[in-house]
Amino acid sequence: VQGKGCFTVDTNTVIVSDSEVENIADYLRTYIPLKGNNAIENNNISLAVDKNLGTEEYSLSINENGIKICGGTYGGVFNGVQTLLQLLPHEVYSKSAKLPMNVPYVEIKDKPQYDYRGLLLDVSRTFQPVDEIKRVINYMAYLKLNKLHFHLVDNESWRVELKKYPHFALEGGFRGGDAKLHPMHGRFDEKYGGYYTQDELRDIVAYAAERNIEVIPEIDMPGHSKALGVIHPDILCNYKPNTSQTNGIDIRNVWCVAKESNYAIIEDIIKELVEIFPSEYIHIGGDEVSFAQWKRCPDCQKLMAQKGLNGGEQLEQHFLN
């Protein structure tokens, strides 16, 4: 509901916040250069958690007494701040807005329709530097999205530093030139790509968390594993992989289900990922598995017979379990 009049944000306005949302106050100051936390009557922006509100629900009140944002959780308060920024002059997003600024009187109570509001970012096929990922996260925050599905591994590359298997990223993160992976585009003598160190990934996770975004990593398997199969062929079934095609067409891009050593590698991978990503989810893709490789693999066929499995779908279920 819009009222009559405007509240003026000026150099004397301060941001007052509960301790649990101090990060949001700091975030808001990056757009509006205000001081904090000494309350001035009728000239402050108040950020507070109100447990009576839903998980990401918020209320935003702007009147002659100031600006008050309450949220049921950190995420609710952050959503309210996004709405406040969108009510201010658009120059706030270029960090060039000058005080004073007027914002209309309003009373807003809002909550998301969906708990999961996600964006999938595929950095396996096209590597993006950390700053670009943070730029995407900022756009997500503007849109009040809260899940970043981080597609880190596919046929084209391996982008995650692993302490136990450093060659996965050192060799699997690059294409062309002297790299083991052939280029998908461009000249063969040009090496390109990259990977993310664990410190860089933790930085991305923290940056996203401040903006109410959970980062969910994806390591695509048992299919979509061409790059890893080239640099670590032991994961594949027992016939020579074809490295002439690296754009996902080659069917030999699947983990061998019959190799017990593969499950130890996967466990090692997951152990390192959970130390980097606090998300309760680690996505493993599971899509577009070419069962033809397992059909040609004598070890996989033997396993199917031993377990009484019928077809690739049941063999994949065995792998996942």
Label every PLM stretch briefly:
Residues 124, 153-157, 220-224, 287-289:
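Active-site beta-loop-alpha junctions enriched in small/polar residues
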